[in-house]
From Swiss-Prot:
The gene is DPH1. Residues 11-54 are annotated as: Disordered. Component of the 2-(3-amino-3-carboxypropyl)histidine synthase complex composed of DPH1, DPH2, DPH3 and a NADH-dependent reductase, predominantly CBR1. It comes from the Eukaryota. Its main location: cytoplasm. This is 2-(3-amino-3-carboxypropyl)histidine synthase subunit 1. It catalyses: L-histidyl-[translation elongation factor 2] + S-adenosyl-L-methionine = 2-[(3S)-amino-3-carboxypropyl]-L-histidyl-[translation elongation factor 2] + S-methyl-5'-thioadenosine + H(+). GO terms for biological process: protein histidyl modification to diphthamide. Pathway: Protein modification; peptidyl-diphthamide biosynthesis. Binds 1 [4Fe-4S] cluster per subunit. The cluster is coordinated with 3 cysteines and an exchangeable S-adenosyl-L-methionine. [4Fe-4S] cluster binds at residues 147, 251, 380. Catalyzes the first step of diphthamide biosynthesis, a post-translational modification of histidine which occurs in elongation factor 2. DPH1 and DPH2 transfer a 3-amino-3-carboxypropyl (ACP) group from S-adenosyl-L-methionine (SAM) to a histidine residue, the reaction is assisted by a reduction system comprising DPH3 and a NADH-dependent reductase, predominantly CBR1.
Length: 439
């Protein structure tokens, strides 16, 4: 599944199969010398325009049908089958089609660290099958999530097309400054084992909210019917717009009710994204199924302690005179609309503000700013939630800064995780804006 430059999100049929040593791949019958798929070729195509002016011309809708000559290219399919893992869908055919039809010359590839092992392979495939004038650039900077799509760096490198792997279309395509293709890298897992595990551990009639990262989103929707028919488990995929149904991010998740759900089930490895749903829904028990280890575990989060720590930080920040406003520059993490809103409100409350741009935020770095009494960071909310205690001075999220100024509320142990929701702070909005009542 992927999002294309037309803005359509859809599934594809191309499924790569198991990898092998590149040296053992069969010889190509093509007259072009065969690469070993271990690096990128030299040379660069014409530089793309670096204009940041948004094109407002409405273009006609185009059907993105991948030509048979690409889908049925025997040499291409052999390379995919022998160099990339069979259960990871890198959508190579679609990528080649978009590059060709848009006449792109210099391609930027951006992916999280876990996929960089395949970066040079994909780079070589694109260069060989898109033509001799094509060059690629692998963007090796850290990519934490969908907020890190880095079109600005791609433009600075002279690229005219960006392929962003393993994250959903969090940053709208029409706001990105060059052509972009989001490749979700959907991963196939053993759904039979999932159904057996759930059937053994959960009672018939259990109301399950199933969530996961975008890689496992197709699996979530496949499991819904199977769990109902084979285990009697009523499974639904909650949604917070504009994310997909069942999709959860470390900073953004759906708010659920105990009247509707008995449990939250997260499909994926690690806890980072699951913790978002746990923080947003502290009264609903949470479980995690790891498709790699095939383990099902009950997960816990100390909501009381977390909220207590954040309330103390907010209270301490209230006494500040000078507040540093951090704009994250890692990809698209920072939102200038959010920054401007916060600065205006802080100044109106009598706080002196200073804006600091940082790609990554560390305690030692902020300690250098001795004249700042407290910080508000427009980058990643989880940085404050998870690591705020490690900073010498309060490090607030935009939401917490609004609570500090009595522009939002933090009641009891309820802590919202809607940063990139449709009306979230990550989009320059105020989700719980106070409405003026006419008298």
């Amino acid at each position: 599944m992927s999002c294309s430059a037309s803005g359509e999100c859809k599934s594809t049929t191309a499924t790569p199969v198991a990898p092998c040593d590149p040296d053992t791949c069969k010889k190509s019958t093509s007259t072009q010398p065969r690469k070993r798929f271990v690096g990128r070729a030299n040379g660069s195509g014409p530089s793309a325009s670096t204009s940041l002016v948004k094109n407002t011309t409405r273009r006609p809708r185009i059907i993105n049908q991948i030509p048979d000559e690409i889908l049925n290219d025997e040499e291409l399919n052999e390379v995919i089958a022998t160099t990339l893992p069979k259960n990871y869908n890198f959508e190579i055919h679609k990528s080649i089609w978009h590059i060709r039809k848009n006449n792109c010359k210099k391609i930027a590839l951006q992916m999280p660290e876990g996929l960089l092992i395949y970066a040079c392979i994909i780079s070589d495939i694109i260069e060989q099958f898109c033509g001799p004038d094509i060059s690629t650039v692998v963007m090796g900077d850290v990519t934490y999530g969908a907020c890190c799509v880095d079109d600005f760096s791609a433009i600075a490198l002279g690229c005219d097309f960006l392929i962003h792997y393993a994250h959903s279309c969090l940053v709208p395509i029409d706001s990105i400054k060059i052509k972009v293709l989001y490749v979700f890298v959907t991963i196939e897992i053993d759904t039979d084992h999932v159904v057996k595990s759930f059937k053994k551990n959960f009672e018939t009639g259990t109301r399950m909210a199933m969530v996961g990262t975008i890689q496992f989103n197709p699996t979530i929707h496949t499991l819904k019917d199977r769990l109902l028919n084979e285990a009697g488990i009523v499974c639904t995929a909650p949604q917070i717009m504009p994310l997909s149904k069942g999709e959860v991010l470390g900073c953004t998740s759906a708010n659920m009710s105990t009247e509707d759900y008995d449990m939250i089930m997260y499909i994926g490895d690690g806890r980072f994204h699951l913790e978002s749903a746990m923080i947003h829904n502290p009264d609903i028990p949470a479980y995690r199924y790891d498709p790699y280890s095939r383990k099902l575990t009950r997960e816990y989060f100390d909501q009381v302690e977390m909220v207590s720590v954040r309330k103390r930080a907010i209270q301490t920040a209230k006494n500040a005179k000078t507040i540093g406003l951090i704009l994250g520059t890692l990809g698209r993490q920072g939102n200038t609309a959010t920054l401007d809103m916060l600065q205006e409100k802080l100044n109106s409350k009598g706080y002196e503000t200073h804006i600091v741009l940082l790609s990554e935020i560390f305690p030692a770095k902020l300690a250098l700013f001795d004249g700042v009494d407290a910080w508000v960071q427009v980058a990643c909310p989880r940085l404050s939630i998870d690591w705020g205690y490690a900073f010498p001075k309060p490090l607030l999220t935009p939401y917490e800064a609004m609570v500090m100024m009595d522009e939002d509320t933090l009641e009891g142990n309820d802590y919202p995780m809607d940063y990139y929701g449709k009306e979230g702070y990550g989009r320059g909005k105020q989700p719980r804006a106070k409405k003026e009542i006419a008298i």
